[in-house]
């Protein structure tokens, strides 16, 4: 049986509930509105940041680099496309300029042909790049090579080749272009690394080592360039459906020539390129563009290293068994 005091308090409780609900809902919608406005301003600022920016992209003739060229071009950037194959670069420029789907003013790209493993060529290429527009706003270090093999079977020459392409080449090009950015107190360095720059998986030692080195170098660079107002972004994709595994080198330096299942099931390079564009436009510092499990593995490596190492050892046993069967 409800007491008289309880009956008297019920209207007060209902009134308080009504006041609380009517106060919280507008506050909630206001917060959502502010968040939406913030995201809209981020999007607009990112678009403005990329429009007419001089963007250099290495490894632009295929895979992620080619798709990055397309999205940066469509965003109105002034492109300098780099690669080893001049014919493929010219074909890409014809493909870009033939498109009429862009909503902003576009600019005919320049091309610079050179090999990232040739230190002498990099110095000359940097000078040629600067001659195109007189300066560089954004450098996208995308070119790279993958690797498959056991550590014991892999020659040191192969280790060096992977490091030259994935680490020393981008470092040399970055150092060659940095003085012009420092002089202007303006610039943005982007390193397309890999999830394997944060975790290491078996039979990828040379590749993982080169990407770990990339992560470390550009993290250091970010801190050192802060005083010059130069941005540094490290992007770590997971598996992307490109020919990266097909063109990978093996333990003896020969071409792997196989599309791995994980690569075949990877994300579309078109989607990843859009994410790269967004990350650069928002000036993000460090971005992981991988599926849930690889992303969780990054945290597992730190929070439960013993479990992570056991899982990698198990993976190595399974891969070894499948190759021997």
From Swiss-Prot:
Membrane disposition: Single-pass type II membrane protein
Recorded superkingdom: Eukaryota
Predominant localisation class: endoplasmic reticulum
GO cellular component: endoplasmic reticulum membrane
UniProt organism field: Pongo abelii (Sumatran orangutan)
Location of the active site: 207 (proton acceptor)
Cytoplasmic side: 1-17
Topological domain spans for side Lumenal: 39-325
Alphabetical UniProt keywords: Endoplasmic reticulum, Membrane, NAD, NADP, Oxidoreductase, Signal-anchor, Transmembrane, Transmembrane helix
Subcellular locations according to the entry: Endoplasmic reticulum membrane
EC number from the UniProt entry: 1.1.-.-
Record protein name field: Dehydrogenase/reductase SDR family member 7B
Chain residues that bind NAD(+): 62, 64, 207, 211, 242
């Amino acid at each position: 049986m409800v007491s008289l005091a309880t009956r008297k308090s019920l209207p007060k409780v209902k009134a308080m509930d009504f006041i609380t609900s009517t106060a919280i809902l507008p506050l909630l919608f206001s917060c959502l509105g502010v968040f939406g406005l913030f995201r809209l301003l981020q999007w607009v600022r990112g678009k403005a940041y990329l429009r007419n920016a001089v963007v250099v992209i290495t490894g632009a003739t295929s895979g992620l680099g080619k798709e990055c060229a397309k999205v940066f071009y469509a965003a109105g950037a002034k492109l300098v496309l780099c690669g080893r194959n001049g014919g493929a670069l010219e074909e890409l420029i014809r493909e870009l300029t033939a498109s009429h789907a862009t909503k902003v003013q576009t600019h005919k790209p320049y091309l610079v042909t050179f090999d990232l493993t040739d230190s002498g060529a990099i110095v000359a290429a940097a000078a040629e790049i600067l001659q195109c527009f007189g300066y560089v706003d954004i450098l996208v270090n995308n070119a790279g090579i993958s690797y498959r093999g056991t550590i014991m079977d892999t020659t040191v020459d192969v280790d060096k080749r992977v490091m030259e392409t994935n680490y020393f080449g981008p470092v040399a090009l970055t150092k060659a272009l940095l003085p012009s950015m420092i002089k202007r107190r303006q610039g943005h360095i982007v390193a397309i690394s890999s999830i394997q720059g944060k975790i290491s998986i078996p039979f990828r030692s040379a590749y993982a080592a080169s990407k770990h080195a990339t992560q470390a170098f550009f993290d250091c660079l970010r801190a050192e360039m802060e005083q010059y107002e130069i941005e540094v972004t490290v992007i770590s994709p997971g598996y992307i459906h490109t020919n990266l595994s097909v063109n990978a080198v093996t333990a003896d330096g020969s071409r792997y020539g196989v599309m791995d299942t994980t690569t075949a099931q990877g994300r579309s390079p078109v989607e990843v390129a859009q994410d790269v564009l967004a990350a650069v436009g928002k000036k993000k510092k460090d971005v992981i563009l991988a599926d849930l499990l690889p992303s969780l593995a990054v945290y597992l490596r730190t929070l439960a290293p013993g479990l992570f190492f056991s899982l990698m050892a198990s993976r190595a046993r399974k891969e070894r068994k499948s190759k021997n069967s």
